[in-house]
Amino acid sequence: MMAIRELKVCLLGDTGVGKSSIVCRFVQDHFDHNISPTIGASFMTKTVPCGNELHKFLIWDTAGQERFHSLAPMYYRGSAAAVIVYDITKQDSFYTLKKWVKELKEHGPENIVMAIAGNKCDLSDIREVPLKDAKEYAESIGAIVVETSAKNAINIEELFQGISRQIPPLDPHENGNNGTIKVEKPTMQASRRCC
């Protein structure tokens, strides 16, 4: 019997850093060069194995534009994890990332797993944010950090695997609704015939 855990994950960060592209690459293994900016938020799901569980990621991709910033708490409330994305070629996006982390720490779920994704690592020749800086910052806040490229499918799966590994295992003695669905193989039963 394999348990399916539903894990709400939100993506936060500046507009244009590649949040939607990361989600599309992870869920659909697709990259769109002409993707439109997200309005409000978009939603996708993907289920992946993790140990003896299945993690069903309920992924909320939030808009990065300032005018939608006030909607973000609606998406990170109740989240098991948050992926805060910055563009390695834009120092300003790394500064904004720190504001998102501060907001999550003040208003987000207490035990939220935080992952920092430095996207567009395929453009490392025009890098503005050293990986060393991202690693030091991630360590200081207890987050995982991964450099990704949605365009070239670099470390996208690893990002979500890292989140899965940080999610505490289910307590087998816990009662109640914890977002888990039991999946069992159907058993063959002898059929009864009437008449």
UniProtKB/Swiss-Prot annotation:
It is a lipid-anchor. GO terms for molecular function: GDP binding; GTP binding; GTPase activity. The keyword Membrane applies. InterPro entries: P-loop_NTPase, Small_GTP-bd, Small_GTPase. The keyword Nucleotide-binding applies. Mg(2+) binds at residues 20, 38. A motif (Switch 2) lies at residues 63-79. It is found in: Golgi apparatus, trans-Golgi network; Golgi apparatus, trans-Golgi network membrane; Early endosome; Cytoplasmic vesicle, Phagosome. Transmembrane segments: none annotated. A lipid is attached at residues 194-195 (S-geranylgeranyl cysteine). SMART domains: RAB (SM00175), RAN (SM00176), RAS (SM00173), RHO (SM00174). GO terms for biological process: cellular response to insulin stimulus; endocytosis; Golgi to plasma membrane protein transport; intracellular protein transport; phagosome maturation; positive regulation of phagocytosis, engulfment; receptor internalization; regulated exocytosis. CDD domains: Rab5_related. Pfam families: Ras (PF00071). A motif (Switch 1) lies at residues 30-42. It catalyses: GTP + H2O = GDP + phosphate + H(+). The small GTPases Rab are key regulators of intracellular membrane trafficking, from the formation of transport vesicles to their fusion with membranes. Rabs cycle between an inactive GDP-bound form and an active GTP-bound form that is able to recruit to membranes different set of downstream effectors directly responsible for vesicle formation, movement, tethering and fusion. Required for the integrity and for normal function of the Golgi apparatus and the trans-Golgi network. Plays a role in insulin-stimulated translocation of GLUT4 to the cell membrane. Interacts with OCRL. Interacts with NGFR. Interacts (in GDP-bound form) with RIN3 and GAPVD1, which function as guanine exchange factors (GEF). Interacts (in GTP-bound form) with EEA1. Interacts with EGFR. Interacts (in GTP-bound form) with APPL2; interaction contributes to or enhances recruitment of APPL2 to the phagosomes; interaction enhances Fc-gamma receptor-mediated phagocytosis through PI3K/Akt signaling in macrophages. Belongs to the small GTPase superfamily. Rab family. This is Ras-related protein Rab-31. It comes from Homo sapiens.
